[in-house]
Each structure stands twice: as structure tokens, then as C-alpha cells.
Amino acid sequence: MKSPKELTLERRLLRILEEGSHSHALAQTLVADEEIQNIQDYGNNVSIKRLGFNDHGPVHMRQVAINALTMLRLLHQAGIPMSLEKEQVGTYDDSACAVLLASFLHDLGMSIGRQDHELMSAIIARPIIRRLLEGLEGLDARRRTMIECMALEGIVGHMATRRIHSLEAGLILIADGCDMEKGRARIPLAISLGGQEAHYGDIHKYSANSIEHVRIDKGQTKPIRITVHMSSEVGCFQIEEVLIPKINMSPSKPFVELVALVGGESERHYL
């Protein structure tokens, strides 16, 4: 059974997309797909209970999808053509489909393990992507193939260990890095410190636990502004060691402002 948080995120996700579009229909199919739900749930079990990492399950992937599609829409509203549009091979909605698929499926590989999970995610996701795209009316084989390939680019590139080249794929790793609010760290932090000493890697959980809120909206000088609200300085670790490396590897970097706020202090501009 889905959690209230998952259902809330699904409603937010559907509101971002235009009703009647392929991307909206695809989102409806994604959130209702039993196979995807089962893989996401089990992957979260592996991540939190077996490996001691933070949330990599259905809540995380829905939040990343919201983050990515929010940034996609901001670029579109600013008149920035996505790679498929610029190359005159696809539409904005094709890009939205690819971004949606990549973000919603990017961590399926955590159901196997952490090492090379982005590659495992692509392997697991490919037949699912094909099945879902074949169910959309009005998409010919050429467009389905194009969307599939771009979605896979976003999945394999989300760890910032492989060079990616499209704006669409570049949004996935930034969107992933933006999901660092304290709620994502609370469960594994409680498990890891339940009567035990803190161990190597807990800095990620402590730093994420100091992130109060991440806001993505229209920038002042660039189309996208990411504002990270923190309760303490330790949250800077999450920004500097997780988010910024992903932004630096993203083709979408030129369009992003990054600002941090610690308590009531003035803004810290990273980008």
C-alpha cells in the first residue's frame, strides 16, 4: 500500500504536466504500475535496511521527478529549447517524457545493490520503458526509440560519473542532488544510531538532517534558482560534496543559480 507521502507527491507530479499530453498520460501509467512500485519498494528496503543508506525508494523517485520536471518547465518558460527541440528531432513533450522516465526510474538498480546501481537501473528500466511507451497512442517507433535512449542517458548519468550531453539528462542528476531534505535522512539515521556509535558515512545523514527545505523556482539572472534552507553549517557538506559536483557535470549548469541560507543569515551564492 502506498504511503500518504507517495500519494501527495503523485498529485503534485500530475499537476506539473499538461493534461492530454503524452507526458501526463505516461505519469498516470507510471504511478499505477505494479512492477515499478514493487521494485522501488524492495530497492528502498535494500538501501535502508541492508546497506544503511538513505531513502532510494518510491518517495525519493517521485520527488526527483517533481524536481526535474519543475526545472524542465522553468527552462521552457524562459524560452530555452531542450536538446530534442534544438536538434529538431523532437518536441518539448518528448523531452518531458524522457525526463519523467529517467527521474522516476533512476534508482531501480538499488534493488540489486549500490555499486554501479545506475547501470543496473538502466538494465532494469529498459524493458519497462519500452512497455510503457508502446502503450501511448500517437507515438511512432522513431519517437519511442528517441525517448527511450534519452531516458537511459539520464539514468546512467545521474551519479555524475559519466559524461552526458543533453539538457534533458542534465536535469536528472541535479534533481537527484536536490532531494536532500532532512526527512530523507531521518529513518536511516535513527537506524544507524540506535544504540550504536556513528560510523563512516554518517556525515551524509547528519548533513542531510540539517537541510530544512530545498526550493526550485525562477531565478533572478538565470532560468532556475535552487535555494537550500539549512538549520546549521553542516548542511554545507551536502551542498558542496553532493549537489555541486552533480551540477558541475550537468549540461544544464549554465542555467542554474544555487543559493544557501543558514538560519537567518544572508544568502550564500554558490552559483
For every predicted segment, state its role.
Residues 1-29, 52-55, 59, 66-93, ...:
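Divalent metal-dependent phosphate-bond-processing catalytic cores, especially two-metal-ion Mg2+/Mn2+ enzymes
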Residues 114-127:
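Post-HEXXH active-site segment of zinc metalloproteases
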Residues 116, 129-164:
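Contiguous mid-protein beta-loop-alpha structural module that forms a pocket-lining wall or clamp
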Residues 64-65, 122:
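Hydrophobic face of alpha-helices
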Residues 60-61, 95, 151:
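Hydrophobic alpha-helical transmembrane segments of integral membrane proteins
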Residues 25-48:
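Short alpha-helical hairpin
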Residues 98-102:
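Active-site alpha-helix of zinc metalloproteases
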Residues 122, 152, 168-171:
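A general structural signal for well-ordered alpha-helical packing
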